[in-house]
Amino acid sequence: MAGQISPTRSALLASKASLKTANGGADLLKRKRDALIGEFFALVKDALAAREQLSSVSKGAYTSLFGAKAWDSPEAVESLSLAGTGDYAVDMQIESIYGVKVPKINIPERAAQADFSPINVGARTIQASNDFGGVLEAIVKVAATETKLRRIGEEIKKTSRRVNALEQVVIPGIHDDIRFIRSVLDQREREAGYTQKKIKAKIEGKNKEAREAAAATSHGSAAD
């Protein structure tokens, strides 16, 4: 970058201002990254808990299903399973976590009992239906939590790349510019000082010659 800038004092001031801005930007990005990392690990715990909950409710639901199949007729079990194949509405909003847009899902309360055909069904079949409703809720929770986790992770990588670019490319480049400008300005100052000394010496030499000439003329007049 040094060869592309004009080595002037105004350019030096501009480079110093750019360096201050770049350092400030890097510090802000680091703080953002640290906050996101903290949020990421909190979400990891939530995601693991959601997965464990899904595993637990799934086991319970299949246990209920096996009991329903053992005690109720296949028609009753199928009737109640078909009753739960309708649309499952969730309330999804978008929230911002340190500037990262992530989904916020509110799971609505399920009805106490699903609609089903008027076939006589037992309590075990109804319980199995309710348990699988819990599985669906757990799946939605896992999906929402892991989506947040993925987006936060992507933002951490993006922020880290920006920090690295500033610290490894931009800031060192500005330092190079400042060193280049200072070296040129220092060289110019030395050259200007050397030139001034030469001019001063030349002027003093001429003044000395003039004084000597004047003195010689004065002595000559006195002799006459």
Swiss-Prot record:
GO terms for cellular component: proton-transporting V-type ATPase complex. Residues 201-212 have a biased composition (Basic and acidic residues). It comes from the Bacteria. Pfam families: ATP-synt_D (PF01813). Keywords: ATP synthesis, Hydrogen ion transport, Ion transport, Transport. GO terms for biological process: proton motive force-driven plasma membrane ATP synthesis. Residues 213-224 have a biased composition (Low complexity). Residues 190-224 are annotated as: Disordered. InterPro entries: V_ATPase_D. The keyword Ion transport applies. Belongs to the V-ATPase D subunit family. This is V-type ATP synthase subunit D. It comes from Deinococcus radiodurans (strain ATCC 13939 / DSM 20539 / JCM 16871 / CCUG 27074 / LMG 4051 / NBRC 15346 / NCIMB 9279 / VKM B-1422 / R1). The lineage of its organism: Bacteria, Thermotogati, Deinococcota, Deinococci, Deinococcales.
